């Protein structure tokens, strides 16, 4: 079963995703964040301390289909947090050292879509419950920069693909989860 949990920043989506897991004794937590500065290091440490000790944590943001596969114990639950951070990391990885104004966003989106399609296929083959957390990016103003506009567009299309493939979709607003699929 594939479940997508979406919502704005600080909406309570992580808490809601963890509630969907319940008291499962076998959890694979896939963290997609990278430590790029002190503020992000503090955020990651805060999340680490909040997780139960028995959760198995893997910090990775590429080739996630290799972690989510048909050999996973059906009693295990997979929690991937967060898809939007994964998309951000992929964008900057594909962009390399080039100036973002020189990036080939169409080629980048194709590469990201290939990664997302592999992730979806893995989730659908996986016998365990897979919960994906993502940010709802399309409810704000039109971003000022080219990079931010492309990011919003790519992340929005990724979310649409995930929602279409998911068995359940939850939108979390102000700490309240609303099942929309």
UniProtKB/Swiss-Prot annotation:
Any one GO biological process: DNA damage response
Molecular function GO terms recorded: adenosylcobinamide kinase activity; ATP binding; cobinamide phosphate guanylyltransferase activity; GTP binding
Enzyme type, top EC level: transferase
Sites where the protein binds GTP: 7-14, 31-33, 48-51, 59, 81
Disulfide bonds: none
Keyword Kinase among UniProt keywords: yes
Gene3D superfamilies with a match to the protein in the record: P-loop containing nucleotide triphosphate hydrolases (3.40.50.300)
A Pfam short name: CobU
Keywords recorded for this protein, A-Z: ATP-binding, Cobalamin biosynthesis, GTP-binding, Kinase, Nucleotide-binding, Porphyrin biosynthesis, Transferase
Induction annotation: By cobinamide.
Active-site residues from the entry: 47
Involved pathway(s): Cofactor biosynthesis; adenosylcobalamin biosynthesis; adenosylcobalamin from cob(II)yrinate a,c-diamide: step 5/7; Cofactor biosynthesis; adenosylcobalamin biosynthesis; adenosylcobalamin from cob(II)yrinate a,c-diamide: step 6/7
Similarity field: Belongs to the CobU/CobP family.
Function: Catalyzes ATP-dependent phosphorylation of adenosylcobinamide and addition of GMP to adenosylcobinamide phosphate.
Quaternary structure annotation from Swiss-Prot or TrEMBL: Homodimer.
Protein name: Bifunctional adenosylcobalamin biosynthesis protein CobU
UniProt gene name: cobU
């Amino acid at each position: 079963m594939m479940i997508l949990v979406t919502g704005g920043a600080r909406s309570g989506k992580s808490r809601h995703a963890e509630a969907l897991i319940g008291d499962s004794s076998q959890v694979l937590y896939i963290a997609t964040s990278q430590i790029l500065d002190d503020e992000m290091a503090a955020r990651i440490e805060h999340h680490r301390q909040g997780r139960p000790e028995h959760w198995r944590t893997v910090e990775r943001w590429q080739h996630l289909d290799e972690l989510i596969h048909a050999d996973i114990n059906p009693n295990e639950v997979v929690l991937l947090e967060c898809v939007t951070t994964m998309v951000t990391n992929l964008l900057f990885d594909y962009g390399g050292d080039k100036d973002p104004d020189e990036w080939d966003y169409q080629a980048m989106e194709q590469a990201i879509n290939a990664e997302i399609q592999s992730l979806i296929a893995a989730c659908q083959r996986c016998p365990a419950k897979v919960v994906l957390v993502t940010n709802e990016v399309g409810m704000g103003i039109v971003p000022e920069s080219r990079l931010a506009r492309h990011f919003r567009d790519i992340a929005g299309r990724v979310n649409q693909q995930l929602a279409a493939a998911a068995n359940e979709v939850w939108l979390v607003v102000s700490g309240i989860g609303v099942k929309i699929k």
